[in-house]
Amino acid sequence: MNNNTGLKVSVLMLTYNQERYINEAIRSVMLQETNFPFELVIGNDASTDCTGTICADWQKKYPEQIVLFNRKKNLGLQQNFIQTYAQCRGQYIAICEGDDFWTDKRKLQIQADFLDTHPDYSTCFHRVINYYEDRGTKSLSNGGQKQDTDISDLARSNYISNVSALFRRGLFGELPEWFARVSTYDYAIHLLNAQFGKIHYIKRPMAVYRQHGKAIWSEAGTDRKLDIALVVDRKSTRLN
């Protein structure tokens, strides 16, 4: 897909009733140090708390860089993603949900530099700190993770934390019709992208993935392989 805006990265942020966390999430994005322009596209799914007001305050501070959709009607996770994704204009897309945050100011630069110099890769992701808020404990993700993988690896399990991903926009054209029916968007979007290039892992931890009881889209269901048959090209995938 051509990018005529000059934007290197669109950061896609979905949020709903996350007034406790959204400031930290947005701040971590706006503190990124890059040699390229990027935008933050926020889809606030009709929050009933102060999330929308907080987002609007940030948008007033950075009107040229933050695009805010304060939805009047709750769309649900999948439709909120679909509609927010459609507004992203960058060459690459990163994801930071409203209760997660980035910890490395060079995260976007490091990942964009990799994709710039490795055109045969569709996606790169990195290690994250899993923060279990209810217990107050932390752990590092992706122990023993291979540095380079492809769609056949990803079809077995989703090892990409959303808050860590950077991927090329428009590899597969428009989102397919079935996309609205999957339980969560993350696995499906990574599989769609992986049809068109390899996946690279950066061992450096650069974000916090917050896990807590009120996270409305953490591990939504166990059938994470729903619709894989529609996503994975059998000619390019080798499952044992």
Regions found by a protein language model. Name each.
Residues 7-10, 39, 188:
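Cell-envelope/extracellular polymer assembly enzymes that use nucleotide-activated donors
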Residues 27-37:
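Short, acidic, metal-binding catalytic loop of nucleotide-sugar glycosyltransferases
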Residues 44-53, 73, 97:
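A conserved acidic beta->alpha catalytic loop
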Residues 71-88, 110:
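Glycine-rich, basic loop-to-helix element that forms the pyrophosphate-binding segment
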Residues 86, 126, 142-224, 228-229:
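Conserved nucleotide-sugar donor-binding catalytic segment
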Residues 93:
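Short aromatic/hydrophobic "clamp" motif used to bind/position activated sugar donors
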Residues 105-138:
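Conserved donor NDP-sugar-binding/catalytic core segment of glycosyltransferases
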Residues 237-240:
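Conserved small/polar residues in nucleotide/adenosyl-binding loops
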